Amino acid sequence: ILDIGFGDGDSIIKARKRQNQKIYGIESYEIGVNKVITYINKLKMKDIYVYKGDVVEIIDIFPDKFFDCVNIFFPDPWPKRRHHKRRFISKYFLSRLKDKVKKTNEVHITSDHINFIFDTKRIVNEYLKKNLHFSNHRSDRPITKYEKKALSKRHIIFDIIFNL
């Protein structure tokens, strides 16, 4: 499992408790990385690997066809138009990610930010050359701190699940 932008580590920690798989997390913020490392050391957990940095720069360290699935739960939506260039989901990134995911395995993107998720859906549709729809099930994804916050504000949670 590749968890991109795991924040304070909720999704990694909960996924590891439910599944007996290796989990690789990439996060650009040091606080989240440190929290997960502390948790790993405290419980002497194996099979969780964390990387601090930009996923666009780090993704190439992994061999092709390495990940069973990719989770991108509540990434920073960079809501201001002038910051949209900071969003990492692009056709270019999807093409690089495609090489790293085993065939027929899924990418799961979740957000409560409507402009971000519709823009992401458009990019994915253009890249895959098909019309994806929002998923009406949340599968077994963990409820993170960010989702709890969104739900407390009565935001709608959007899930896009697709195969690269």
Regions found by a protein language model. Give the residues of each.
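A short glycine-rich, Lys/Arg-flanked "PGG" loop and its adjoining helix->strand segment in the class I
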Residues: 89-103
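SAM cofactor-binding core of SAM-dependent methyltransferases
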Residues: 1-56
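A short SAM/SAH-binding and catalytic strip from SAM-dependent methyltransferases
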Residues: 68-87
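Class I S-adenosyl-L-methionine
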Residues: 116, 120-122, 127-164
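A structural alpha-helix within SAM-dependent methyltransferase catalytic domains
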Residues: 13-16, 94, 98, 121
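A short acidic, Gly/Pro-enriched loop at the edge of an enzyme's catalytic core
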Residues: 61-69
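Short "lid" loop at the C-terminus of a central beta-strand within the Rossmann-like core
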Residues: 77-78, 112-117
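Conserved beta-strand signature within the Rossmann-like core of class I S-adenosyl-L-methionine
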Residues: 104-111
